[in-house]
Design a protein with these regions (language model features):
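Beta-rich carbohydrate-recognition and catalytic domains
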Residues: 2-156, 161-219, 231-278, 292-294, ...
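Aromatic, loop-rich ligand-recognition surfaces of beta-strand-rich domains
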Residues: 369-435, 449-488
């Protein structure tokens, strides 16, 4: 149900959010040269020169005791009580353990189990704690019922605790011909498997959305990954992602079964798929049920401005039709957690723009093209950068989203991200501009790579963003997207 706004309302509801999610302290990507060095094989995956970039992806979410715990790749954790305001939290480890890509978190028999892909974690292991944020200690490497290490390799693991307290693990390895595997684990000794691994899913070219490539053009090639298990109305939904995390067609599929270890019947239509706009390539995530019974899809959102694995995170509702098939409508406009859509639209996309300067070919129009991998950057000598958009008519403006573009981040040289200090000015008029409002955030002290804010409604035609240069002169700040939301 949509929560349409009345004409006289001057502010969006308090429970409003907009994708990609606002998450502070975006970390440096695992494959950034500052982490792996410039001679790594991943250097070929950069757009332009190899340089440090920030990313979050592959979200797994736990709802526990009134709080939502978001565990993404590369980061630590984020905690929320309302799905709107997320607080960055460090995970505590007892003996120097660490997470790699695609963590998984589950509460089973009063204890919390945590694991992640072996790359960048350094080993395959399951961790245990008595609180969601730890301290976690390693239980060791999981084995099957014969004591053999689980094979193939432990990538994108998922730990699932059923209603009866039985524990299961899911993981995958590689692309075509490999697939997704599962095994039951002993909940009293979570690294001990019961029986042998079972192959649950593999690439099926009849499901075109699984085929590799941005247009699913590789009919004999795939990369099936990102498994996640969820139980709904007595059925088991094994979620997976396909076609490649670097593509806009990256998508979520699902198989259904009456048993946690299958057999699974694949839903013929993707669950979550969006190829265009600021929120696209919506794969690899998880479902989580809230206290009111609503089910939420958290997902990865493609950026790839600097690196093919540069990602963000989004969330939207899961809806089940009468046949039990799952569907997620990906959104990139303000939404109410309690009420859905608000009838507020982007009013700035592809509108005329001006800027104080432009570095090279990073023109002002690229900040308003609703695209993830283009950006505006002011000239290096511009001491007072600003960018302005002409909405062509006066609009009732309720909110904005700015996605910053950073160049020059280098953790080996101490050039680190920092909070943006900025303001938005609003003007009305045709022949002569009249300043009608200023939203000032020069006192911002949070490192927000993505910033979404709603304020008291302003009626204006022109919107200008001005900001202070970075404190560290090596850090260059531009705008990936500035999106203004409103209505006539």
């Amino acid at each position: 149900m949509e929560k349409a706004m009345q004409k006289e309302q001057r502010k969006l509801p308090e429970d409003t959010w907009c994708n990609p999610l606002v998450l502070e302290n975006y970390p440096i990507g695992f494959l950034a040269p500052g982490r792996v060095g410039k001679n790594s094989g991943s250097m070929a995956n950069f757009n332009g020169p190899a340089r440090d970039f920030r990313e979050l992806g592959d979200p797994e979410v736990l709802y526990d005791d009134g709080r939502w715990y978001l565990f993404p790749s590369v980061g630590e954790a984020y905690v929320s009580t309302d799905l709107v305001n997320w607080k960055y939290e460090k995970i505590k480890f007892a003996n120097g353990e660490k997470l790699g890509y695609a963590p998984t978190i589950v509460k089973c028999r009063g204890k919390y189990l945590l694991s992640s892909s072996w790359p960048f974690a350094g080993k395959t292991e399951i961790l245990q704690a008595f609180e969601p944020l730890g301290p976690y200690h390693s239980l060791g490497e999981p084995v099957d019922g014969e004591g053999k290490c689980l094979a193939p390799e432990w990538i994108d693991p998922m730990l699932f605790c059923d209603d009866d307290g039985r524990l299961y693990a899911y993981w995958h390895f590689g692309g075509t011909g490999e697939g997704i595997f599962g095994i039951e684990l002993n909940p009293d000794n979570p690294i001990q498997g019961i029986g042998k691994p079972v192959k649950l899913l593999d690439f099926n070219p009849e499901n075109q959305f699984e085929c590799f490539g941005d247009f699913n053009e590789h009919s004999d090639m795939a990369w099936i990954e990102g498994e996640s298990m969820f139980k709904h109305n007595g059925e088991y939904y094994l979620q997976y992602s396909a076609c490649g995390t670097q593509f806009r067609a990256y998508t979520v599929g699902v198989g259904r079964s009456k048993s946690p270890l299958g057999p699974f019947v694949i839903q013929k239509t993707p669950v979550a798929r969006e190829k265009y706009g600021r929120v696209c390539g919506t794969g690899h995530g998880s479902w989580v049920k809230g206290p009111d019974g609503s089910v939420w899809q958290f997902y990865t959102s493609l950026t790839r401005r600097i690196h093919m694995f540069e990602r963000r995170i989004g969330m939207d509702r899961v809806k089940f039709d009468v046949n039990g098939d799952a569907h997620v409508q990906i959104t990139a406009v303000p939404q109410s957690v309690g009420g859905g859509g608000l009838g507020i639209l982007p009013v700035s996309v592809f509108k005329k723009s001006l800027a104080s300067s432009a570095a090279g070919c990073c023109y002002s129009g690229f900040a308003f093209d609703d695209c993830t991998h283009t950006w505006w950057m002011p000239d290096d000598i511009d001491e007072h950068p600003w960018i302005e958009v002409d909405l062509l008519q006066d609009f009732d403006i309720y909110a904005f989203q700015v996605i910053w573009a950073e160049e020059g981040v280098d953790i080996t040289q101490g050039i680190l991200p920092e909070p943006a200090k900025y303001k938005l000015e609003f003007f009305s008029g045709n022949d002569e501009k009249k300043l009608v409002a200023v939203w000032n955030f020069y006192d911002n002290d949070r490192d927000l790579l993505i910033d979404f804010r709603s304020m008291d409604m302003v009626r204006a035609r022109y919107v200008r963003l001005s900001y202070l240069p970075s404190v560290n002169p090596g850090l260059k700040r531009g705008v990936n997207n500035l999106t203004v939301f409103g209505k006539r």
